[in-house]
Amino acid sequence: MAAGLRKRGRSGSAAQAEGLCKQWLQRAWQERRLLLREPRYTLLVAACLCLAEVGITFWVIHRVAYTEIDWKAYMAEVEGVINGTYDYTQLQGDTGPLVYPAGFVYIFMGLYYATSRGTDIRMAQNIFAVLYLATLLLVFLIYHQTCKVPPFVFFFMCCASYRVHSIFVLRLFNDPVAMVLLFLSINLLLAQRWGWGCCFFSLAVSVKMNVLLFAPGLLFLLLTQFGFRGALPKLGICAGLQVVLGLPFLLENPSGYLSRSFDLGRQFLFHWTVNWRFLPEALFLHRAFHLALLTAHLTLLLLFALCRWHRTGESILSLLRDPSKRKVPPQPLTPNQIVSTLFTSNFIGICFSRSLHYQFYVWYFHTLPYLLWAMPARWLTHLLRLLVLGLIELSWNTYPSTSCSSAALHICHAVILLQLWLGPQPFPKSTQHSKKAH
């Protein structure tokens, strides 16, 4: 009898869930005109797009030729570690020395074994296809929580970008691996799991250093949430993980590991630049130009921190105090505060990058809808925002890059920056209840 009651209870729960699902779908159909405009339908539209992406991604794998660029070099680099070489200065592949931190080595070592020592390209493509779908899922969860972007925009973030599909499943770069870990980190931060969020942020940095472009925003959020003393344990997690991952290489040749894997002064080839094609090559390579870009980058970050992110009326130095001792009572960080700060921090860094290569598109591609629609200026209509997205996509799909494509990319970046500066305040009232921070 008890078993019968349990069975009826389970079937009753299933029937109730099915009824709720049908009710939701019926309501969505009745409001179908709003389906593509109302952010509350993000999950429904996301589910449809993810299903479409399964077919599109695997069609691309089977119908479009794979292009070898860095995969063999990655495999040669991790094979050196497998063979017992822990001196980073002795690790290299076909395209040059190993220049990525230790997290890259461990993850691609796993891929090395999963793909028969790197020879099974189709298996690698399938793994990266799953990685692509996981990235979309994590990004959609972020957009669902911020509830700012109309769902029709997500079509342009998914099915319409040839370059992004190519980066993931036709080129097998390490950039997507770093970004999926970064988006996982942001989801954890949104769930107020700050320790785990910092852990996965550091793991993403250990795959590729571009994730450090989010670091100024993360530091600002940590200080806002915890103050200086409270932020130290979270920063310790970030630093400690880097030490643990790099320990075998640090013990062998510490200076070699640090100089190779965290080389901030590495020179880029003018041949591959997407964003500075209109400059003379001599200027592109000049240290004074690099210093000017760094100065502009840091200046704009400081301006955003002072004028857009910090709006309490107190000095920004008040962030160093314990939140309970500040004059203005601390408020829980909302999803939009977290996402806008991180995405803006990264975008500013990209605008002033010394060079952008084609695979770097994934560094900010999935953040563009938020940057354009979450804090829109009145003068930037839906049509103009779509035009900006289209021009950015066209610029990244122009190979080799031209003076016009590079200039168009900078103009689009300037439009987005102007909107971020002149648009509504990036800290709207949260639509969700705050959760206890961990």
Swiss-Prot record:
Localization annotation: Endoplasmic reticulum membrane
Taxonomic superkingdom: Eukaryota
Entry keywords, A to Z: Congenital disorder of glycosylation, Disease variant, Endoplasmic reticulum, Glycosyltransferase, Membrane, Phosphoprotein, Transferase, Transmembrane, Transmembrane helix
Catalytic activity: an alpha-D-Man-(1->2)-alpha-D-Man-(1->2)-alpha-D-Man-(1->3)-[alpha-D-Man-(1->6)]-beta-D-Man-(1->4)-beta-D-GlcNAc-(1->4)-alpha-D-GlcNAc-diphospho-di-trans,poly-cis-dolichol + a di-trans,poly-cis-dolichyl beta-D-mannosyl phosphate = an alpha-D-Man-(1->2)-alpha-D-Man-(1->2)-alpha-D-Man-(1->3)-[alpha-D-Man-(1->3)-alpha-D-Man-(1->6)]-beta-D-Man-(1->4)-beta-D-GlcNAc-(1->4)-alpha-D-GlcNAc-diphospho-di-trans,poly-cis-dolichol + a di-trans,poly-cis-dolichyl phosphate + H(+)
Pfam family, one: ALG3
UniProt entry tagged with the keyword DNA repair: no
UniProt-recorded name of the protein: Dol-P-Man:Man(5)GlcNAc(2)-PP-Dol alpha-1,3-mannosyltransferase
Source organism: Homo sapiens
Taxonomic lineage: Eukaryota, Metazoa, Chordata, Craniata, Vertebrata
